[in-house]
Amino acid sequence: MNIISWNVNGIRAVEKKGFLNWLSDCGADVVCIQETKANPAQLSENLISPPYGENASAALSDSSGGAGLFDDCKRYFSAFSSAKKAGYSGTAIYSKVRPDSVENLGDARFDDEGRVTIAKFGKIAVISAYFPNSQEAGARLDYKLEFNKAILKKCDELVSEGFNVVLGGDYNVAHTPIDLANPATNEKNPGYLPEEREWFTSFLNAGYVDTFRKFNSEPKQYTWWSYRFHAREKNIGWRIDYWCVHKKFEDKVVSSTIMADVTGSDHCPIQIQIEE
């Protein structure tokens, strides 16, 4: 199973930057999206049911948005978790095969912000997660740590039920100094606070694996860059997007990579391949 995760920083905005063409061509079986900043009622037909494969380009060039035309066009199934607050947060999962079931975290504190979408395919549970930003001066640090606790609990429950949990998304934390360009000057900044990093360590100690580091120990491997100061051009970034699995299923991971050449957001996609 080929799975991609991407914080698109607004799905309607990235649609205007070629997102649907990218999605059609990316070859993924499942695509996890974070920071949709929209609810399904605000989206085009092609964002609700994105075409792929033969006839996809024709459907995407159709001025009506693809509604009702090209019925033989293959389309992704979609599941959205939207925030109650308009234009904020939100997650989604696209899949070529309809999931057996779709659910949220089951905690209104976080479901009201659309933080998690879970899709089950047999005994694989794919999770698209948008971890909270702790914000300046740690204004939402307590909220984030409560979210972290809740998602770990959910993952543990799924693992205990025999699911291979594949947790992807924007974790909003750079775990170690190798995971950001300027660690020394960011020690008091959101995304690199000691409490956030300590939680990630405890998450790994609880039996989960940062799959990218399973294959790649090199520095300067980032997934997010500020829009300011030509940061991406200079590769002054942070690695805050991850694919994690439980160590029980670590041997199922074939590869875990960063798709740094894909643009359209301040994040780039990340990809994992797992044996089914």
Task: Give residue spans per PLM region.
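Metal-dependent phosphoesterases centered on the DNase I-like endonuclease/exonuclease/phosphatase
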Residues: 30, 51-52, 58, 68-69, ...
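Active-site beta-strand termini and strand-to-loop segments that position acidic
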Residues: 96, 119-122, 246-247, 272-276
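Conserved beta strand-loop-helix elements of the APE1-like EEP
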Residues: 86-102, 219, 231-251
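Active-site-proximal beta-strand elements of phosphoester/diester hydrolases
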Residues: 1-9, 123-135, 168
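Short, acidic/polar
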Residues: 12-24
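Active-site beta-strand/loop signature of hydrolases that rely on acidic residues for catalysis
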Residues: 7, 23-41, 126, 155-177, ...
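Structured beta-strand-rich core segments of catalytic domains in phosphoester-bond hydrolases
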Residues: 37, 44-134
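Surface-exposed cleft-lining segments at the edges of enzyme active sites
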Residues: 107, 131-148, 185-188
